[in-house]
A protein has these predicted regions:
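ASCE RecA-like P-loop NTPase motor cores
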Residues: 1-123
C-alpha cells in the first residue's frame, strides 16, 4: 500500500522519533502539524505499528471526515467510528437507535480487546 511506503519514508527521516518514543512508552506526545496532515500521521503510525488507536476529533462532522481520510490510507475495514448519541439516550421518549448502539459497541469492544484498529470519536 502507498501508506507503507510513505510511513517508511517518514520513519527514515527521523522527524517524529521523539514523539513515537513517547507514545511507545505510554506518555503523551504533542506534534504541531496542519490539521490536514493529522489523518496522514495517524495512518502512518498505524501502518508502521498496528495497534488499538483512539482519535478524538472536534465534532461529529470532523470525526466522520477524519475517519474517511484515515480509511483511505489504511483501509476502511481498519477504521471504526464511535458515534455520538443523538439527544439523551436515556430519555423515555428517545427512539430506538440499534445501528448507532451497534456501531458504538463495536468500537468500544475493539478498544477494550486491544484490536488493531483506529477508532475515531468526537468531543
Amino acid at each position: 500500500m502507498l501508506i507503507d511506503m510513505l510511513s517508511a519514508s517518514l520513519a527514515k527521516s527521523g522527524a517524529l522519533d521523539d514523539a513515537w518514543a513517547k507514545l511507545d512508552s505510554g506518555q503523551d506526545a504533542t506534534v504541531g502539524v496542519a490539521s490536514s496532515a493529522r489523518p496522514f500521521l495517524v495512518a502512518a503510525r498505524f501502518a508502521a505499528d498496528p495497534r488499538a488507536t483512539l482519535v478524538v476529533a472536534a465534532g461529529e462532522e470532523a470525526a466522520d471526515t477524519f475517519a474517511r481520510t484515515v480509511g483511505a490510507f489504511v483501509g476502511e475495514e481498519r477504521v471504526l467510528r464511535l458515534p455520538d448519541y443523538e439527544g439523551n439516550p436515556f430519555s423515555l421518549d428517545a427512539p430506538p437507535q440499534p445501528r448507532l448502539h451497534g456501531r458504538r459497541l463495536e468500537a468500544l469492544w475493539s478498544l477494550q480487546q486491544g484490536k488493531p484498529a483506529v477508532v475515531v470519536a468526537s468531543a
